[in-house]
């Protein structure tokens, strides 16, 4: 009885997770094959492809109170170690580009601690924290969870690996738990690395795409680019649905040189001075 009482105190229930998980499985079809391919490319087990279920339920627009973004929930600081995170482009928001970053991070974690429970927990808690825990308790993950003390090693980090295992079990038995799933099919995308900077209006005109279509096909493009304040950067891998745009390279060749640029538009910055008000600054810049 005492063991059951002790176990019951470690159980926490969240309502509404079943429907959220079902939708996540259905959404995952858009990206799962490519995610598994990337993990294999980095020599990682394909089971890691369920981590976005834990992090975001495969919602590309997911954004946490801590500033983590995208299906892999990279914070800005960690994201910058593995991908482009800036004012014009935020690759954390692109499911495929972020997967390359996640693969690099997970590979680094595992090569450092040589234990998947610790490496996966490090994805949430941070590698240095897990290395400190490993130094005290070795690879005994149960001891790490029960005895490792750190201000930041709270409920979420302690249970992250358990959530991963639960998600893996559900995904492997998805038809049992979720009959009649409607899995979304991958979108056939064509992409092209831009040799110069171009404006979003130019892209709309010559690639025959609406602003919304460009945004959906290129989720890493941020609002300043989409509203014309910034240009689509040189070297950016512009993406379009293959059935919509058959040959991006040929279409790019039709763009006049006068609307291709060698540099980005400068940002409009204003230093707030004593006595300024928000409405006054907005009026100054017409916003």
What is the meaning of each model-derived region?
Residues 45-53, 69, 116-121:
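Alpha-helical scaffolds flanking conserved acidic
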Residues 60-62, 224-225:
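A short, acidic/glycine-rich surface segment
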Residues 62-82:
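Short, surface-exposed glycine/acidic/tryptophan-bearing loops
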């Amino acid at each position: 009885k005492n063991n059951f009482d002790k176990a019951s105190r470690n159980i926490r229930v969240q309502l509404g997770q079943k429907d959220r998980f079902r939708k996540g499985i259905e959404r995952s079809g858009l990206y799962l094959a490519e995610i598994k391919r990337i993990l294999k490319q980095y020599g990682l087990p394909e089971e890691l492809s369920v981590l976005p279920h834990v992090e975001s339920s495969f919602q590309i627009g997911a954004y946490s109170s801590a500033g983590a973004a995208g299906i892999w929930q990279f914070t800005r600081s960690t994201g910058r170690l593995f991908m482009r995170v800036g004012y014009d482009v935020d690759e954390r928001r692109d499911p495929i580009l972020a997967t390359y970053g996640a693969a690099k991070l997970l590979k680094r974690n595992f090569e450092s601690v040589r234990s998947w429970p610790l490496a996966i927990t490090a994805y949430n808690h941070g590698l240095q924290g897990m290395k400190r825990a490993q130094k005290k308790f070795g690879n005994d993950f149960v001891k790490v969870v029960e005895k490792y003390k750190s201000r930041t090693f709270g409920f979420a980090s302690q249970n992250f690996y358990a959530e991963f295992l639960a998600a893996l079990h559900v995904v492997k038995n998805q038809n049992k738990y979720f009959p009649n799933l409607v899995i979304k099919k991958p979108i056939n995308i064509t992409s092209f690395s831009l040799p110069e900077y171009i404006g979003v209006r130019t892209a709309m005109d010559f690639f025959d795409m609406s602003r919304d279509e460009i945004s959906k096909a290129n989720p890493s493009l941020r609002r300043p680019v989409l509203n014309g304040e910034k240009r689509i950067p040189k070297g950016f891998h512009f993406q379009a649905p293959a059935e919509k745009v058959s040959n991006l390279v040929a279409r790019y060749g039709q763009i006049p040189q006068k609307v291709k640029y060698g540099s980005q538009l400068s940002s409009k910055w204003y230093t707030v001075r004593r006595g300024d008000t928000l409405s006054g600054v907005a009026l100054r810049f017409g916003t």
